[in-house]
Amino acid sequence: MDQSRVLLWVKAEPFIVGALQIPPPSKFSLHYLRKISTYVRTRTIEGGYPRLSWSTWRHIACGKLQLAKDLAWLYFEMFDSLAMKTPEERLEWSEILSNCMSEDEVEKQRNQLSVDTLQFLLFLHIQQLNKVSLRTSLIGEEWPSPRHRAQSPDLTEKSSCHNKNWNDYSHQAFVCDHLSDLLELLLDPEQLTASFHSTHSSLVSREAVVALSFLIEGTVSGARKIYPLYELALWHPLHAETGFSKASKTFSFYKLEAWLRTCLTGNPFGTSACLKSGKKLAWAHQVEGTTKRAKIACNTHVAPRMHRMVVMSQVYKQTLAKSSDTLVGAHVKIHRCNESFIYLLSPLRSVTIEKCRNSTFVLGPVQTALHLHSCDNVKVIAVCHRLSISSTTGCIFHILTPTRPLILSGNQRVTFAPFHTHYPMLEDHMARTGLATVPNYWDNPMIVCRENSSPSVFRLLPPCEFYVFIIPFEMEGDTTEIPGGLPSAYQKALSQRKKKIQVWQKTVKEARLTKDQRKQFQVLVENKFYEWLINTGHRQQLDSLVPPAAGSKQAAG
């Protein structure tokens, strides 16, 4: 590193993947987090600090914060899923859980887990990102509210970033607005007043700055390498600015805070930068008779691993199918795509599907979180670490997941069904993302929102309505069947249906129809099949598989 200017920014992933899209529990307020921060430091032997064990967090969350055990585990496991672990480590954990024969055995294994205490406190604090502010609600909109007006379709407009989890302006504003609180949360108790505030002489430990690297990273202007915050803060030429003392191995609270505020800038790998200066991808074609043009942008040509991003909007009335290096390990946002069939058959880091209608999404394994918001009549087929849904209507989820699907607020007529497809590289992609076939909690969703805890918000697909899904593309690879197979009830339904078809074929064969009768029968069957294609929407899917005219073909990734 030379003496050039330091640039810092707020990392996107903790917010995209780590901030649950609901208002946090009231006990996650700063007041309680400060109390937890002090409490855990008195429990070093019991697993409170510097690593927080699941058993200690369960005691705090359930005993002191009055959270349900399932909710306490949800936040603990969400944070743990952000940790840098190899796919092999994740697969090993799945194997351990799949061998457990009871809830007590599962709990015994969970008790072996621990997370970084200070980073976990920061993680709990950023849940405030989606806190509903009455004041903001009152002053933030015109009255009457112009909700009936169509939103701007332009991807580059801020209107496309209503989801705070994907809005890097919101990430930066949150950290800047709460920077003092974040630093105070990391202070040793003796550095705080009785009211849990810093003083002019408060000192910040190196461990605290290492923890803050969970949210902030940076570089030196003119360099390509990205450094965690603590490496830059400890860089010798910056000691005067950051307030680091070699003698005490601590930072001056106020000098460090001032330096952070001076250096914080926009995320060069965030959504805004991707939309403004990212590479435009010609993956979709213009549909005749439509005015909206599909927009797909990525930053994978400049972004390091873990910072890759693909944003796709306004894909309309077509089939889009990709297996591309551009998608591998990327955070993907799919926005306002309607009446389409979208196949993204690569290992993905996270996926957010927002404001889409009447579409089918077939995804490669999603290593962290798959989230749907404000979607209508959408079918999603995926292997994912976690699924969460909010404000959806009439959506079907064919999933394989090692965690309970999260039903957040505003959902209606949700259907869960077993994962029912495969493509040749699927098992290889699952291994690369650390996702196994067991345990699989597709049929055990968790209703997280308070507004509607009724189980009637969702149903499990009846076996009589179940069909397998065929991916109509040729690829290289070894997977030839659905990973993990199908639940017995669904396999039985398929077998019974197959038997009925065989009986019907035998009946037709033995009917000894004349040549004219066979022709009439063939026409009748074809007409009925054509009606079925139209009524089920499969006709549109077949039509969209026909390659577009030359000049508007999908480009390679």
Swiss-Prot record:
PROSITE patterns: C_CAP_COFACTOR_C. The keyword Iron does not apply. It is found in: Cytoplasm, Cytoskeleton, Microtubule organizing center, Centrosome; Cytoplasm, Cytoskeleton, Spindle pole. The keyword Cytoplasm applies. Pfam families: TBCC. Residues 290-435 form the C-CAP/cofactor C-like domain. InterPro entries: C-CAP_CF_C-like, CAP/MinC_C, CAP_C_sf, CARP_motif, TBCC1, Tubulin-bd_cofactor_C_dom. Keywords: Cytoplasm, Cytoskeleton. One of its GO terms (cellular component) is cytoplasm. Disulfide bonds: none annotated. One of its GO terms (biological process) is regulation of cell shape. Belongs to the TBCC family. Plays a role in the regulation of centrosome and Golgi apparatus positioning, with consequences on cell shape and cell migration. PANTHER family: TBCC DOMAIN-CONTAINING PROTEIN 1 (PTHR16052:SF0). This is TBCC domain-containing protein 1. It comes from Bos taurus (Bovine).
